[in-house]
Amino acid sequence: MRTQLIAAAALLAGTALLAGCRHDAVAAPSPDDVSVPNPDPSPQIRGWLTQMRGATTNSIVDYPTCDKDDANCLWYFPNSTSFRTPAGAVFCTAFDAPAHGTFNCAVRNAQFTLPTRPPEPHSQWHASDIRQGDQGWTIGNFVGQPSVALEANPLPYDTKLVLSHLKSPSGEAPRLECGSFTHGMVCLDHMSAKGFHASRDDFTPFSYPSAL
């Protein structure tokens, strides 16, 4: 009899313990519930972001389009805006279309080592071409034709250009803005919270807190 009572007590205790475990257990959070902290930019990048906030907003007139039979027409794109740093180190062209791949930049006469051409025989390689893809902003890309204008309007130093015609898919504006500074060009894509700094001396992609 005593043995049976001990066994029954042990069974009840085990059941209560399991019930308590079930009551206290916390379900594993779903991926949507996990809070990912904003990236902490380096002091240099924070300085660039501060400059962008304080820069004067400017409006640049589209570069004149050219006749399709003009030999230089490849360098002047209709429905686009082209701008550069006053020193001519960085050129950018923004096309009037709300999709990735409609904004490109290029470094002229780079003083740093540009990426070498990967083994791809059927495309034209532009080592100084800057664009955004799945991996963020990169320099060195295969493009079918020049994607940045040969000539462009100078964007004055300490001035930013808000590309409000390049909107995110949900319609917010602006998606892109670029600032011209004596140390180079800074461009931010607010949809991806990724940006880059480019000059003759460097190309630096970075992430930044979405709330500037």
Q: Where do the model's predicted regions map?
A:
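Extracellular glycan-recognition/adhesion modules and their associated mucin-like linkers
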Residues: 37, 75-87, 160-175
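Bacterial signal peptide processing site
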Residues: 22-24
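Extracellularly exposed regions in secreted/surface proteins, prominently low-complexity, repeat-rich
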Residues: 151-159, 163-212
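Lectin-like carbohydrate-binding module/patch detector with strong preference for beta-trefoil
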Residues: 98-111, 184-193
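Bacterial N-terminal signal peptides that target proteins for export
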Residues: 1-8
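C-terminal motif of bacterial Sec signal peptides marking the signal peptidase cleavage site
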Residues: 17-20
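A low-complexity, Ser/Thr/Gly/Pro-enriched, surface-exposed linker/loop concept
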Residues: 33-72, 102-157, 198-212
